[in-house]
């Protein structure tokens, strides 16, 4: 078996000494332990505190709404189509998707930096005595040995950044769907209000005609004729408001769809109120931690801060690298006898921080403080999420009570109008009484329409508060 030359044994021994020295110095560095990547436990109620049976039924309905597609529960094909189009073309979602791609690419770059690197290099060299000048060219290899703590911190940071980007995408998706639904409901309510005001304008014209006839027979004064005409003008002027609201809602829908020339549903030609659907939720307060994009983002911010603290701690450890080079030396000038010779070198290298005036310790303290900030904000986000969901339930309860009252008033007004019509046909009521009863019924229908819109918006707010439009489980 061939024996190693003495200088080779000495070189090998020197390498071992260097490596052992680096590891020994690493053990001497005092660093506070990095916090564990775990979110704090936040106490939340085990059930919702909705006082009325209406709100309670919204939580315990037999057929709960699927939060990933809650808008379908309204059974409105036009709304379903608008939501689908917005999810496919909205600029906000395009921006979020691009950010997710960027974060994924950065994560791949971070993972790639942990592996060996090969480079084609060329640089001038000079002999130790300064007499010969060479140009050295070849392939350089370098591998920064990833110590376990640094490797785990870098991978954890990349994963947390990706999850934060996905949470932002989920939040944008939920906001977009909520805005599309809310705007669509407002548009339809304004269009139905227009139809009701058209009927009220026709009644005002009839009332003005009847008043003029009565004035001609000296049964009413001229002031009453003027008042009836003024009421008609006011009703027609009032119709401009829902017309403008409908036009504005259509413009907002076009923006949400990402196309100002987008084809939108035809205007409603009927004053019929929207169909009320019995919607329910089975989510409990603890479910918000898994569903709300804001809670998910806060959770990943805690993980990110924990891994950043671990990386700051790893910065105080030695950095060990394996280096290698193979190439050629070209003689540029000098008395050397050989103008071309091969070069090969390989071995370890390390860098160990010894003194930096307290910079590393201050950096670690800062990262620990940022971790404390992230955990505090996580607790706040969880409590705020539960509070917003509870407030949305209470608001829905209120709007459902108002809607029930409005429907009852509308029913009474319609029955009174029908009764007055029958009395007028029998000669027991005059035309003014009939038009006034019908006007009161139309006004009650307008009030009911506004209550229906408020109830629909309350449902939208409730689904949004529960993390509605969350990404399906199969999505990346």
Where is each model-derived feature located?
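Periplasmic alpha-helical coiled-coil/stalk elements that build and connect Gram-negative outer-membrane
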Residues: 151, 160, 167-284, 395, ...
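Transmembrane beta-barrel architecture of outer-membrane proteins
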Residues: 79-81, 123, 134-136, 182, ...
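Terminal intrinsically disordered/low-complexity segments used for targeting and assembly
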Residues: 2-4, 12-88, 243-290, 332, ...
């Amino acid at each position: 078996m061939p024996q190693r030359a003495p200088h080779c044994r000495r070189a090998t021994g020197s390498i071992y000494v260097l490596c052992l020295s680096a590891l020994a110095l690493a053990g001497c560095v005092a660093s506070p332990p990095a916090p564990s990547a775990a979110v704090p436990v936040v106490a939340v109620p085990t059930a919702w505190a909705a006082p009325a049976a209406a709100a309670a039924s919204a939580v315990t309905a037999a057929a709960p709404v699927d939060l990933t597609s809650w808008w379908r529960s309204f059974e409105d094909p036009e709304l379903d189509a608008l939501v689908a189009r917005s999810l496919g073309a909205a600029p906000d979602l395009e921006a979020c998707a691009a950010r997710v791609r960027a974060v994924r690419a950065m994560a791949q770059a971070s993972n790639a930096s942990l592996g060996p690197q090969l480079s084609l290099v060329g640089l001038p060299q000079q002999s130790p005595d300064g007499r010969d000048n060479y140009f050295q060219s070849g392939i350089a290899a370098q591998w920064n040995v990833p110590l376990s703590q640094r490797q785990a911190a870098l991978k954890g940071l990349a994963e947390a950044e990706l999850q934060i980007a996905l949470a932002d995408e989920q939040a944008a998706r939920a906001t977009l769907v909520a805005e599309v639904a809310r705007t669509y409901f407002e548009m339809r309510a304004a269009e139905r209000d227009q139809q009701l005001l058209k009927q009220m304008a026709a009644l005002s014209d009839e009332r003005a005609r009847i008043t003029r006839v009565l004035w001609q027979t000296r049964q009413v004064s001229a002031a009453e004729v003027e008042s009836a005409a003024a009421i008609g003008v006011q009703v027609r002027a009032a119709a401009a408001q829902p017309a403008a609201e409908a036009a504005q809602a259509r413009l907002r829908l076009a923006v949400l769809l990402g196309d100002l020339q987008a084809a939108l549903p035809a205007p409603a030609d009927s004053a019929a109120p929207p169909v009320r659907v019995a919607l329910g939720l089975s989510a409990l307060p603890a479910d918000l931690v898994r569903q709300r994009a804001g809670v998910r983002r806060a959770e990943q911010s805690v993980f990110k801060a924990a891994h950043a603290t671990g990386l700051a701690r790893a910065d105080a450890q030695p950095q060990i690298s394996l280096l290698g080079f193979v190439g050629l030396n070209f003689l540029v000038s000098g008395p050397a006898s050989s103008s071309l010779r091969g070069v090969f070198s390989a071995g370890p290298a390390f860098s160990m921080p010894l003194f930096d005036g307290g910079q590393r310790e201050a950096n670690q303290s800062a990262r620990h403080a940022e971790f404390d900030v992230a955990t505090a904000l996580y607790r706040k986000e969880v409590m705020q999420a539960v509070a917003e969901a509870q407030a949305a339930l209470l608001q829905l309860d209120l709007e459902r009570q108002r809607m029930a009252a409005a429907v009852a008033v509308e029913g009474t007004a319609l029955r009174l109008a029908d009764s007055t019509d029958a009395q007028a046909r029998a000669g027991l009521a005059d035309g003014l009484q009939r038009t006034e009863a019908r006007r009161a019924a139309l006004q009650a229908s307008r009030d009911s329409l506004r209550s229906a819109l408020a109830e629909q918006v309350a449902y939208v707010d409730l689904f949004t508060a529960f993390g509605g439009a969350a990404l399906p489980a199969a999505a990346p």
